[in-house]
Amino acid sequence: MKRKKHVLHQILSEKRKAERIRGGNMSAKDEFGTTKYIIYAEFEANGVVERPDVVGAIFGQTEGLLGDDLDLRELQKTGRIGRIRVEVHTKAGKTYGTITVPSSLDRVETAILAAALETIDRVGPAEAHIKVLRIEDVRATKRKYIIERAKEILETLMEEEIPETQELTEEVKKAVRAKELIEYGPEKLPAGPHVPFSDSIIVVEGRADVLNLLKHGIKNAIAVEGTSIPETIIKLSKERIVTAFTDGDRGGELILKELLQVADVDYVARAPEGKEVEELTKKEIVKALRSKIPAEQVITEMFHKGKNFYEILKEKERTAPSKEVKPAPKHEPKPQPVEQKPREEKIIRPIQQAKSPEIEKFEKFIERVKKEQTAILLDENMNVIAEIPVRDLLTTISTRDNIYAIVFNGIITQRLIDIVSENNVRYLVGARKANVVRRPVNLKILTFAE
């Protein structure tokens, strides 16, 4: 009979342990509410005792020991300590078990209470010994739970919300781009918002091409909208620096040929073979525009030698490194302009034979900006302060000090002259001048042809 009772105690004890493990670290939160600390202790009694005997010994033998403020009965009435849990099991005439005391006292009072438990030396009729195992900070357990749970919630939130947020953002961007799109000229051509006042424009085939360039921050594009070149494009080409940017298919080649015949195009760029401008990524757009070729070279190679644009581009890429290496290290001071002249006459617009001494000191910077649509800002020692796209020139001038000279591949307009003069710039060097009526005394204006 005793053996059967012992087995039942063992089964009950194991079951309770399993329940505590499954409950996890938050079991204290569930059972003890606002508890701050939990005292865990174990006891051993030299005889058979029951749970009420242990609880009675705890209350009885600590009564009056710690004064009225720490009396267990009063503390339990006021909720300063919770329900004392005791688990017991008997083996070989001895009783073993655990004691759990939840406490809302501070850490010092809780430690005193734990030490008081160890003074208990009898449980019922048997001698007993109690030892405190540990005091658990329930708030630390709660903090661990909060951190782990917050991670789970955040992961779920990111999985569920981010795709929806991205779609919402893209919809807003599309709406903004569509609003930025303007209609330009009598033909109401689709164009970016900077076309009316930009010194340079990019001519593309259709509305979708303009929208794609807007998406990637290029706001000076205008579409021809068909195979017939509108009069507005022809007129703009006489006043602005024009880059033709067409699709990489047969249709793009036909539009390019017509543009070169009827408009004053300065540069030619094309999408990669087989691709359209409207489907290009930002990286592909930037690469295509950086690889643009002067229109005179394209006209010569395409109409007189029968080559297509991509053959010209490959030839340029093969020869570009050797052209750059020769002038710089060996003949930088004087021979460089002499070697460059025949190449300039083939690639860039005709240059006058006589050059002023002032333009010669900017010669190497002129050669750099001719290759790309850029502007170079110089200080008094002719050191480069910055090299920026022409479209950012006006905003950059207003935010930088100590600019001595500006060299850029663009048209010198009256508006640019006024802004440059206000910022005490001494030299302004550009491709050509347009409608200049006022020349400030403190500003020297030069063109590539001078």
From Swiss-Prot:
Binds two Mg(2+) per subunit. Residues 199-273 form the Toprim domain. Forms a ternary complex with MCM helicase and DNA. Component of the archaeal exosome complex. Mg(2+) 2 binds at D247, D249. InterPro entries: DnaG_primase, Primase_DnaG_arc, TOPRIM_DnaG/twinkle, TOPRIM_dom. This is DNA primase DnaG. Mg(2+) 1 binds at E205, D247. One of its GO terms (cellular component) is exosome (RNase complex). It is an enzyme of class 2 (transferase). It comes from the Archaea. It catalyses: ssDNA + n NTP = ssDNA/pppN(pN)n-1 hybrid + (n-1) diphosphate. One of its GO terms (molecular function) is poly(A) binding. Belongs to the archaeal DnaG primase family. Pfam families: Toprim_4. Its EC number is 2.7.7.101. One of its GO terms (biological process) is DNA replication, synthesis of primer. Its cofactor is Mg(2+). Residues 320-348 have a biased composition (Basic and acidic residues). Keywords: DNA replication, DNA-directed RNA polymerase, Exosome, Magnesium, Metal-binding, Nucleotidyltransferase, Primosome, Transcription, Transferase. Residues 320-350 are annotated as: Disordered. RNA polymerase that catalyzes the synthesis of short RNA molecules used as primers for DNA polymerase during DNA replication. Also part of the exosome, which is a complex involved in RNA degradation. Acts as a poly(A)-binding protein that enhances the interaction between heteromeric, adenine-rich transcripts and the exosome.
